[in-house]
Amino acid sequence: MEVIELSLPATNRLATEYIEGTFPVHEAFHPCSFKERLHELHKRTYARDALVHHLLAYHKQFQASEETMANIEKLRHRESVVVIGGQQAGLLTGPLYTIYKIISIITLAKQQEQQLRVPVVPVFWMASEDHDMAEINYVHVAQRGKVKKYVYSPLAKEKRMAAHIELDADALKQWIDDIFKTFGETNVTNELRTYIYECMATSKTVADFFATIVLKLFAKEGIVIVDAAHPHLRAIEREWFMTLAHEHEAITTALQTQQRHLAQLGYEQAIDVSPMCAHLFYDDGQRRLLYYDDAQHCFYTKDGVYRFTPNELRQRIESEPQSFSNNVVTRPLMQEWLFPTLAFIAGPGEIAYWAELKRVFEHFHWHMPPIVPRLSLTLVERHIAADLADVHMTVAEALTNGTKQALEEWMRNNQPVAFDETFHEAKKQMAYIHEQLRQLGMQVDPHLEGIMLKNAERVETQIDYLQQLITRRMLQKHDVHVRKYERIELSLRPNNMPQERVWNVLYYMNRYGLDFVDRLLHVDYRWNGMHKIVYL
């Protein structure tokens, strides 16, 4: 695989400036070297034995690789640290950027283990407590030259968290089969489909299905998964839930202070929470955000189902920690409390909202871990590279501007001389002639004006139709060349979005082999914030 680098803007201004190195990092983060961070972490203590005990039991049910189990054991050692990042439990792993985030975690962990000479464990935080199924219940595929969204219908109306939703084996198998039909048959299709069937057969829930695939894909690399909704993990988190509940007002104050500071610097707000938000969810089968009524001195849910005094909430956390989970503000705090975090791998959106957490971390006398932007890739297949060469377009041009403008320019250069001008002149002359006819009609009967104006519109519409008809015939005449532009757009910029946010990794595994992810993992990436163009 050949790699070239390209500078592309991120999805928000703050992340773009952070990646480019123009953001004033001291305003929102605690910049430090990995060596300095390691020294800081060694001064702190963690519930290592309890965490290792849980992770070993959790991964055993998935028959995780020896490499993963060995990495978990490393966490017992006081000098060990982690590189961590997370994502929702998307079906079939979701868009490519989830795979790229895991590759980023593993790659940075390996590099820092060599440089720091301490165990550095790659950890993936699976946000299995998320209940927004619309974000994970589909896969995009290419069908008839368009982006097609294949939704797994049993999840469409689900309100529960991914960790609690059991799979419908028959419906899931049919959904998988339909997706594979769009890929086309290759010499590895049957093997890959069987691979996914096996993952499905050993999975009970949506979260299990995700974890099984990831643990198989990255078995040799020893990736460790944290199931955020697991009841045994929640039991370990009990103590910190207590602290978060007690400190919710201070958390909100610190958050809002930092948000105002960033607003003064000209940055948009990324986290939107109510001033009364308690930053914890309570889940009795339905996940509800807790708020705090200062006048009544109690926690409550907006639907009025629950009200807790501070003491009652503490008792609930003590007796049923599995019913509580974090919001966008407290999840990073829980991660920091649980794991000796050498670095956090972040996507563009995460960079923006972590920037608002600096003072929240400081409230707990912590420094934020180094925030490392995840690797961002575009995969260029050989036939797409050939199409680019044929239409004299670079990857940079395709990713930055898309192909629409280039195609329109090519069509203008290959259409009859003065094509647009001829139709423009025809409309102008027809309007003049029709004006004469209308004046004649008005002399006969002034009431004809409305009818004649509508007739003028119909005449112009017919000229537009004729222009569109000739344009379509020109496109058909140049069909081979036009399709090259369309293929480029569909592959590299589907729906005018980054490739990594649309396509799924299974398409590429079906074309390039079951070891595709492993080969992608072993490309020599540079951590410089540049977008990577990978030629397959």
From Swiss-Prot:
Record carries keyword Protease: no
Alphabetical keyword list: Ligase
Record keyword Ligase present: yes
EC number: 6.-.-.-
GO MF annotation terms: ligase activity
InterPro entries: Bacillithiol_biosynth_BshC, CC_BshC, Rossmann-like_BshC
Domain of life according to the entry: Bacteria
Similarity comment: Belongs to the BshC family.
Role summary: Involved in bacillithiol (BSH) biosynthesis. May catalyze the last step of the pathway, the addition of cysteine to glucosamine malate (GlcN-Mal) to generate BSH.
The protein's name in its UniProt record: Putative cysteine ligase BshC
Source species: Anoxybacillus flavithermus (strain DSM 21510 / WK1)
Lineage of the species this protein comes from: Bacteria, Bacillati, Bacillota, Bacilli, Bacillales
